[in-house]
Amino acid sequence: MYCKCIRAEDFDLNIHDQGTGPTKTKLKSLSQNPLVAETPESALLYSITPNPLYFQRNHFPLPSIPNSSLDDWNIVLDGSSDVNDQINLKDLKALPKTTLSVTTECAGNNRLDVSPPVSGNQFESGAVSSAYWTGTPLSAVLTKMNLSSDVVEILFEGADDGI
């Protein structure tokens, strides 16, 4: 395997956004529930993975999120009386943003090649993908919420749940 770097705008595998039409190349499904699928090897030849081919690794079923306005979403900070306890999506979007090129790899990538065999999803080489990610650094969010610099641990909770 090698990396053939090209400009993102020159990337073409006849890939379309999910839901807009057929693709020549698709994710390789290992599990439907929870959703686990790996990037096809042909897409690993490029520096940026097309969004529809970004590998999927979920430990639990996808959460069921009720239909509501995005204006109703908040990040809530719990556990300290000296902080602004929440920030809404509008305020979050107003914070400075950073764009980074990031490669994400599951620790189980190439598990199929391990000898002796081990349990878990039997990934070949496709539990890795690269993309440009844009967002507000967590440090800026926590500063906006007046979190003390003495805090050493943060627990994140989301809408997903499992056993």
Which stretches of residues belong to each language-model region?
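Structured, non-membrane catalytic/scaffold regions adjacent to prosthetic-group chemistry
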Residues: C5-I163
